């Protein structure tokens, strides 16, 4: 079988769909609600809570083609990308999953059928080898007796990583939790390629390539290392799309598959490269995939966390383009070819193409300004190097001053067979981090450590008051049985009308009360399937299993509802006015205002802001019903519902519709009709990052308060100019005209004063070796008048060196003028540098005119007295 990469992806999904699996869309590269993970790096990431028993799905079998990034953190392939046949920053992981449904028998037989059946991948059976965990007799027997793989091609792999269950064939999510043996399938490329089978001394060669890993989650590892059987064993498998494509397309390198051939050709086209074997072409072809999809999923280049990893990848690509001879910005031009080769897998990227291109172009333009200077510094340092290692301080200086990620510096060094002292770099980086931490004052957030195994039923769509039972209590992140007055805690209820913060909407506030205790809720957060009420017990004692009345702050909730509904209208209005490329990139909805971040590549024009505001208010006046409907996720997408950036959705989703104007997926609380919002006013429009804009706005009471504030301001201004709001513009124009006239008259008086001062000064010039020298400290003269006075004195004296100084607010202002006939001997810039240094300042300028400032007023007389000797030494 020889199919395109896109056809292979679809065939995999079709096969498992035919076996009763739900086809689930790829999740975002930004993991949802998993702070332990930098990027999505495996197909199972989006199902982690399902495997942990914290989440449930409507299906027990799933299949995906998951976008993954491995660059930064534990899984960092960046430095090897471009130099090996199979390392990538971005790849697609094909996977099938069983959540307590089938286990080893079906998982193994499904894999073998897909790989070897004539209807599907039709690989030669004799080319396939498998590994199993050393003690996993069950898997071994299935491969040998049911599938029929010869014993010599089934290899048992034991604990080869230095500890119990530390093996290539034993998978674990972490130090504790679900884990189990795995079985890997390898493809033998043939004896013309060096390498040995897995487990042999030559296993690192390229002959035997792992194409599929089947993980059997059957144990729950305890903190003491004990392995307890899981009540419902599960299956998690992963097969790299690029690897299986290389096998099916009969090539030995992932970079030779159709997808990369087309991308590499596009890279050569935009950079002007002619050597198609250059590793730089492979680097750039790989990097455009990770960069474009990361930006599409909401990551923006920055100097922190995910944004910094993205910046590193972009800058590495730009530097390789520079090596290929690219003369202008090129990287953003690869987004369109990428969309073309990725096919249906790039549908979301295509919607945001303009924004992604703009972010990449802006980042490239910014880095281009420092790239050449940084490379010149690096070349200089390397030319002076006596050993084979560049010191960490220099690598850090390149990062700190020129924006060179250390792996980019390492790339340059590698090409010259040199290394970077990465430990020294990390020491310098850690010193900077320590300084930042010491100045930040951040403390520990114990609540972020809470793990709740129970679930809470949310009733807040229909209720703001609810009778409930306390199911868990947490103090300083630790579970407790009771809390006492004055203690801060998190209270979990079996059901609650309180909305837990999510989707940009802040958590509710209010009270939990019973006859003997009152708990003041200052925030509400989600902890897995549970809703936690964060706050302080103001009176009494509260225990687990106590009954309470949960009372939401209704006034605050209502303001939040209006602001949240307004964000939906704003989103739709922005797409209507600016274009379909607009996508939500974040939001904050509280009781005071709303904040909405969206993709757009330039600042909005005032008329666009007004148009958006008018359009939102028009929908408010239409007083459309705000309707919700629960449906399948795929059905919602077919209906055109827009998904919220960074949010994880269940299979059954809540679709919020406002007439024919807005349809979005949303789990928040909302107005009943758009008319409830009352009024919408935009406060500000600004940029937060390249390609990301932000609008802040107010609604209802907040919008009316803003109008009152603006009206009061107009009244105050009208009073100041002795008018009223009806003729305010005319009055202000009259005041401005008079102000300009007075400024002109004042300037004329200052010019006259300067001329008079100059005339009186000219007589005090001295002759130094036949040259006129005038040095004077002036009182009550503005610094900006000094230049005019020097020009006047030059005209009066004909040939002269002039030094003038004045002081204002404990600061010294200096100017030196030299007529052009004397600049061969005395340069104004050199003279003023000498004077400025004496008064604690610096300055410079042309040979005939230079200015400077200083801070030591007391030293000025002596500095001016030194001028005569300085000039005499040069005449």
Swiss-Prot record:
| Enzyme class, spelled out | ligase
Record text on cofactor binding: Binds 1 zinc ion per subunit.
- Coiled-coil residues are none
Q: Which cofactor does it need?
A: Zn(2+)
Q: What is one process in the GO biological process aspect for this record?
A: alanyl-tRNA aminoacylation
Recorded GO cellular component terms are:
cytosol
Matching entries from SMART domains are given as: tRNA_SAD (SM00863)
For this UniProt entry, the molecular function terms from Gene Ontology, in alphabetical order, are:
alanine-tRNA ligase activity; aminoacyl-tRNA deacylase activity; ATP binding; tRNA binding; zinc ion binding
Enzyme Commission number, as recorded = 6.1.1.7
What is catalysed by this protein?
A: tRNA(Ala) + L-alanine + ATP = L-alanyl-tRNA(Ala) + AMP + diphosphate
Q: What are the subcellular locations of this protein?
A: Cytoplasm
Q: Which UniProt keywords apply?
A: Aminoacyl-tRNA synthetase, ATP-binding, Cytoplasm, Ligase, Metal-binding, Nucleotide-binding, Protein biosynthesis, RNA-binding, tRNA-binding, Zinc
Q: What is its main location?
A: cytoplasm
So where does Zn(2+) get bound?
A: 564, 568, 666, 670
User: Which InterPro entries does the record cross-reference, listed alphabetically?
Assistant: aa-tRNA-synth_II/BPL/LPL, Ala-tRNA-lgiase_IIc, Ala-tRNA-ligase_IIc_anticod-bd, Ala-tRNA-synth_IIc_core, Ala-tRNA-synth_IIc_N, Ala-tRNA_ligase, Ala_tRNA_ligase_euk/bac, DHHA1_dom
Family annotation (PROSITE patterns):
AA_TRNA_LIGASE_II_ALA (PS50860)
This protein's assembly is summarised as: Homotetramer.
Q: Which HAMAP family did the record assign? A: Ala_tRNA_synth_B (MF_00036_B)
Instruction: Give the function comment from the record.
Output: Catalyzes the attachment of alanine to tRNA(Ala) in a two-step reaction: alanine is first activated by ATP to form Ala-AMP and then transferred to the acceptor end of tRNA(Ala). Also edits incorrectly charged Ser-tRNA(Ala) and Gly-tRNA(Ala) via its editing domain.
Query: Which family is it part of?
Result: Belongs to the class-II aminoacyl-tRNA synthetase family.
Q: What is known of its domains?
A: Consists of three domains; the N-terminal catalytic domain, the editing domain and the C-terminal C-Ala domain. The editing domain removes incorrectly charged amino acids, while the C-Ala domain, along with tRNA(Ala), serves as a bridge to cooperatively bring together the editing and aminoacylation centers thus stimulating deacylation of misacylated tRNAs.
Name assigned to this protein: Alanine--tRNA ligase
